[in-house]
Amino acid sequence: MSKFCLCLSLLGVLLLQVCDTRSLLELKIECPHTVGLGQGLVIGTVDLNPVPVESVSTLKLESSCNFDVHTSSATQQAVTKWTWEKKADTAETAKAASTTFQSKSTELNLRGLCVIPTLVLETANKLRKTVTCYDLSCNQTACIPTVYLIAPIHTCVTTKSCLLGLGTQRIQVTYEKTYCVSGQLVEGTCFNPIHTMALSQPSHTYDIVTIPVRCFFIAKKTNDDTLKIEKQFETILEKSGCTAANIKGYYVCFLGATSEPIFVPTMDDFRASQILSDMAISPHGEDHDSALSSVSTFRIAGKLSGKAPSTESSDTVQGVAFSGHPLYTSLSVLASKEDPVYIWSPGIIPERNHTVCDKKTLPLTWTGYLPLPGGIEKTTQCTIFCTLAGPGADCEAYSDTGIFNISSPTCLINRVQRFRGAEQQIKFVCQRVDLDIVVYCNGMKKVILTKTLVIGQCIYTFTSVFSLMPGIAHSLAVELCVPGIHGWSTIALLATFCFGWLLIPIISLVSIKIMLLFAYMCSKYSNDSKFRLLIEKVKQEYQKTMGSMVCEVCQQECEMAKELESHKKSCPNGMCPYCMNPTESTESALQAHFKVCKLTTRFQENLRKSLNPYEPKRGCYRTLSVFRYRSRCFVGLVWCILLVLELVIWAASADTVEIKTGWTDTAHGAGVIPLKSDLELDFSLPSSATYIYRRDLQNPANEQERIPFHFQLQRQVIHAEIQNLGHWMDGTFNLKTSFHCYGACEKYAYPWQTAKCFLEKDYEFETGWGCNPGDCPGVGTGCTACGVYLDKLRSVGKVFKVISLKFTRRVCIQLGSEQSCKTIDSNDCLMTTSVKVCMIGTVSKFQPGDTLLFLGPLEEGGIIFKQWCTTTCHFGDPGDIMSTPQGMQCPEHTGAFRKKCAFATMPTCEYDGNTLSGYQRMLATRDSFQSFNITEPHITSNSLEWVDPDSSLKDHINLVVNRDVSFQDLSENPCQVGVAVSSIDGAWGSGVGFNLVCSVSLTECASFLTSIKACDAAMCYGATTANLVRGQNTVHILGKGGHSGSKFMCCHSTECSSTGLTAAAPHLDRVTGYNVIDNDKVFDDGSPECGVHCWFKKSGEWLMGILSGNWMVVAVLVVLLILSIFLFSLCCPRRVVHKKSS
């Protein structure tokens, strides 16, 4: 027994040492980002570091928060401290037995316990106060406090963070707003529980999610016998004949992070009934220990009874004495007395089995899990803005209903979330702007064109430089700040117009001077080469006739005869043949002198002077010298030619709408196709792309007979017949060792026996001292119980099994006045008398039998599992722990237990199986699974439909139009289409784009499928397919392109609206991202490209737009032109012609 006590002391020391390792802990409160006017409470909890049992009486929960805190945290609460200890008359060498220890009861006061008075949480929302309290889980030497914070939901608005204190430990309370509008964050989705569920309601209209439940006992003195809650438990367990159940009260429970209080028992609330049933089955709670004690051991000393309160004459409470890691709450209330008696039992697990009549208690706090039906909040798309900032860009993302998923391959997203009114705001930085910014937000792919950001920054800079004339500077900046050749041509055009009369003569002068220099250098180089060649030839001729040209004394090779003669006279006499200065007549001395002599080229220079000097020829050089670059005729002619050329370049370099969908098209031809043979299109199309094909089919025998042909193919929709497998759960694996010296293993109830998923192996009646502590009574007694179980279960995702798959597209054709539409799938066709459209096949990564896992909203995408267990699941497999409407499905633990023994030491259990849940193993190898994204999902009880936004799938399409079309019947089209423009928003240019609203009328027929385009006078910038019905139709066209002078009109075929509207300039300081899937379309109508005529028309429209726009800009440009002409006249005056005198 002494060794046993020594072990307890060492355990207490170890627990105390943990206290100093961490002095600040975090208690997180999750709030919805929209706080309504209804009632509601938020709750948070945190486990603190162990504290010694002796210091518990001095604990006081302090707060620096600006809450209206209930006074219970400072109120003294009388409790009975019930402990166990070795009997005083037990000898040191005595063996452990049921008679060697005893219980002890004392009275003391504790402050801040979770003893909540009545009406504190029941009152109206405006009168509710914040409750801060703590619970205790203790062994004989130390306690683990658990701090609870229950606050009205409006504190989410008034509080960001504050501090709580318990003893020497500090708790940082952090209010964190989730992206949920009003629901709770479960499985990455925003879940709103349904308080009342109609059984007749279709099952696919709600979902069932398991969320944690925290309950607090509230004693209440009343004459209502229905509040004898122990009687309720006994009734559920069909226990009768018990009379000691007089305590009256109820539990107030909270679901998840925020909820209304639920009062248990309440028979008309199905949630309260379920919680009451779970309490009866798991009286200690469904969460069995702290997160840090998943692998632990404890030793049972034995059963004992005691007095509560200590003044009782007989025992009123019983339990099991233990040592080791604490498991459950050590605070209870006595069930037998009507007046509440609170018990604190460190090192004792009180009796809470409701099938026992006497000496039982109720836990002061209870934690469990509750499956609840409810709905998932709908999500909205994100709006993303970006601005240039330094070398990168600052971006903001907004969403009305919260941002549940945001990522970017080009930006740094720190996940720090803020809320702006009813919207969620996330700010992030993009370091590079040389590539377009790509952001995935709420299941949508957004792209921000960085060149539009550069345009905005250019306009801002230009306007800032010329801030004295902001209106004029801004209008000019809008025209100049265009990227690419188009922008440079605009700058060149305006510079030529304003300053051409100065720039042309200046540039001409510089060019002429450079050409003169080159002409002179080329001529000079030619003269030097000829001179060197002449000297070489003279030397060669002298060598042929006279012999060597090398001096015999200094060995210097001479180039001419006079130089050799001077060497022969001077070198033998010790004189330099060039400067005639005396030196030694040796080769080394003469050669050293030649290196410093400055007259070694004297003979070459004399020969050069004797030749005639070079005179430049009178051809190119003279022409350049006398060129009249200052002539008004020359400058004016060049000025006009440059303006015309620059206008053509400006128009030709304008951006056109580019198609970037990765599709392959084998169709060729113009807008009008003579139908000499069958018209066939055979192409592959990405799943997210739409395809529009329009042509006029011409009769080759009669060119006047034409049939309009329109073909539209919608984006692919994936239809999956599914089986809802339920919710995948994650849990904590626990390995426990329970040991006692005497008695069979069935003598005690172990904690894992009330867990939903557990496995136990008992090693009963040890046969030797090798597995018995020294203070045990002997061999052949006692038990080592090994158990593994799962707790802290939480839902992590929804799981669906694919039964069958179907890939469909909506196809429509309009041939003359005949219209036909059909939804086709793989190996299906739309067939008419003249047209056949087939989807031949689909390349897909989905297969029947796959399992789809969604770890958040459907829009966040999912993971494809090729193998998913549904029948015999092992712990660690995908699908190991499942929550289904039929209940919890537990996995099998395939490992084996091993009892680790040492002589005279308490044994411990080891487990050689897997200890990681399937969810944790999946996270560790997530990159090995295929993932997919979803857009526009629609789910029912047995089907799931969605669109693939990534274009990861492709369809093979084949279209054939028979050449035997009846031109006589179809060429006469009675349908009359009229177009008019209604409104426009957005900006011209190739960045942000614009939205043109058209009013289209249809007469003479009931319906007509055609395309409406957005065009200016020169070309078109966007189109859409419209299925018109008789009367007025509103059509929206998204386009990109144009210029400041573009008046965008609504056009059908060659007819356009009589008026057009101008779009705004692309100078917004914030650029909005666009959805890639909205722009993922192919439009092919065979219209010709913009040619020379189109270029001049576009240039004229642009000039007219400038003239009709800000007239001050035109005035400034004209003033600059006049000023440049005036300066030209001053600098280049007219040449005076002198007449000859007669």
UniProtKB/Swiss-Prot annotation:
Keywords: Disulfide bond, Fusion of virus membrane with host endosomal membrane, Fusion of virus membrane with host membrane, Glycoprotein, Host endoplasmic reticulum, Host Golgi apparatus, Host membrane, Host mitochondrion, Host-virus interaction, Inhibition of host innate immune response by virus, Inhibition of host RLR pathway by virus, Inhibition of host TRAFs by virus, Membrane, Metal-binding, Phosphoprotein, Repeat, Signal, Transmembrane, Transmembrane helix, Viral attachment to host cell, Viral immunoevasion, Viral penetration into host cytoplasm, Virion, Virus entry into host cell, Zinc, Zinc-finger
Cross-referenced Pfam families: Hanta_Gc_C (PF20682), Hanta_Gc_N (PF01561), Hanta_Gn-B (PF20679), Hanta_Gn-H (PF01567), ITAM_Cys-rich (PF10538)
Residue ranges that the UniProt entry lists as topological domain Lumenal: 22-489, 655-1110
Segments forming domain ITAM: 617-640
Transmembrane segments: 490-510, 634-654, 1111-1131
Zinc finger (CCHC-type): 551-571, 576-597
Topological domain spans for side Cytoplasmic: 511-633, 1132-1142
Keyword Signal: yes
Motif (YxxL): 621-624
Signal peptide (from-to): 1-21
Positions of region (Fusion loop): 763-783
Glycosylated position list: N139, N353, N405, N933
GO cellular component: host cell endoplasmic reticulum membrane; host cell Golgi membrane; host cell mitochondrion; host cell surface; membrane; virion membrane
Gene3D superfamilies: 1.10.8.1320
Database matches in InterPro entries: Envelope_glycoprot_Hantavirus (IPR016402), Gc_C_bunya (IPR048791), Gn-B_hanta (IPR048790), Hanta_Gc_N (IPR002532), Hanta_Gn-H (IPR002534), ITAM_motif_hantavir-typ (IPR012316)
GO biological process: fusion of virus membrane with host endosome membrane; signal transduction; symbiont entry into host cell; symbiont-mediated suppression of host innate immune response; symbiont-mediated suppression of host TRAF-mediated signal transduction; virion attachment to host cell
Single annotated GO MF: zinc ion binding
Residue span of region Binding to the ribonucleoprotein: 522-539, 594-611, 598-609, 617-631, 1127-1142
Note: This virus is non-pathogenic.
Family as reported in the entry's similarity comment: Belongs to the hantavirus envelope glycoprotein family.
Protein name in UniProt: Envelopment polyprotein
Encoding gene per record: GP
